[in-house]
Amino acid sequence: MRSNRNTSAGSDDSSVIRNDMRHSRRGFLKGIVCGTLAALVDPGIFAVRAHAAEARGGRVLILYFSHSGNTRRLAEMIHEGVGGEMIELKTVSPYPQDYDAVVDLARQEQREHARPALSTELPDLSGYDTVFIGYPNWWGTLPMPFFTLLETYRLDGKNIVPFCTHEGSRFGRSVDDLRKLCPGAHILDGFEVRGSRVSGAREDVAEWLSGLNLSSAD
């Protein structure tokens, strides 16, 4: 599951994207049950402890956008492993919960190069060495709110670690877009998982985190 390979070929196919977003909605309902069961798993499976990770990577921020809840659950697993601060990116105008409506709006925003206004109050990002950026794959890349954020705040010199939920299109072209949006940052090895499998991804997340060579960006 751990890969930053460019898998954009075919990632814009509407059937793949719609399948991504349809399964994300189903995964939200399934996750209510599976997430409860996952909470019973011994947290000791995480090989990375928060204090050790922060010692290697300096101050850590986990910044994520989640529509159906899958990416939020993945962010929580990462937070358990590395500690730091966790912030959910939200927009002034919330996205609709209706599946067809959010699919159409996400596509429209991408075509129009929209930059949705953000309602999230962010801390001074200069104080962080490592920023985890989490998102669902929408139409082959990051949701447009992240374009708003990353065109506003400079992350030069920082470690950026992408993590992504999807239902078949993996990272799409999102990692390439991150490199364009953050040309002065260090993009580290990311983690991608199907949204429907997030609840069972704890061991994979732990293995991925243990393999990250987090070092101070200074």
Q: What do these predicted ranges mean?
A:
Residues 14, 20-21, 27-49:
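N-terminal export signals
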Residues 44-76:
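C-terminal segment of N-terminal export signals and the immediately downstream linker at the start
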Residues 65-67, 89-91, 165-167:
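Cofactor-binding loop segments of dinucleotide-utilizing enzymes, especially the Rossmann-like FAD-
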Residues 94, 102-186:
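Helix-loop-strand module that forms the ligand-binding subsite of alpha/beta enzymes
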Residues 193-218:
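Glycine-rich phosphate/pyrophosphate-binding loop and the adjoining helix
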